[in-house]
Amino acid sequence: MVKKLLYIICYIFFWADISLSLPLCTEVDVRKWTNCKGEVNTPDGTKFIGEWKEGNPNGHGNLTYPDGRKYVGEWKNGSHDGKGTFTYPDGAKYVGNWKDGKQNGEGVFSYPNGAKYIGKFKNSRQHGEGTYISKTGEKLIGLWTDDQLNGKGIFTSPNGEKYEGEFKNSRKHGKGIISYPDGKKYSGEWENGKIKSEL
């Protein structure tokens, strides 16, 4: 944890040093902006402030949309690429890795209602190992595909209830074992979140 924190601090100071050393973009033609810092405002109210290379946002920059959406982070060839934060008008937020303008790699997506997903993403979808935590503390842990938990996984509840088994579209589906706070266990088969039969 300490090493990770030190890395983040070093990264911030490193970027700040590089950013301060870049000159302001002075060319009238944006396509000629390279290795400089500049601001662009479009007629629809979109604004970008940051670093440029060969006419494209490249390095670190802030993009603000007229509807309130905002991206702050790294860019490559005009796309979100690297580490960045995207916030939405409704309060939702994604913090994590990007590739070619999409959420890819490790990240955290926070929902407006207080729920949260922590794990891997692919093409802006929850995809790979991850944990979903509801606003009331329930957890879904396992492998995700296209925003849904599929295959083997674990469900836990704040009251001590625990299910280990198969899921389909984030619902208990297939074989599984559920443990209750009083110590009782049930082994059986589920279908669309409901008990189908006892094993």
Language-model-derived ranges and their functions:
Residues 2-11:
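Sec-dependent signal peptide recognition
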Residues 5, 15-199:
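Glycine/tyrosine- and acidic-biased, solvent-exposed loop/turn segments at the edges of beta-strands
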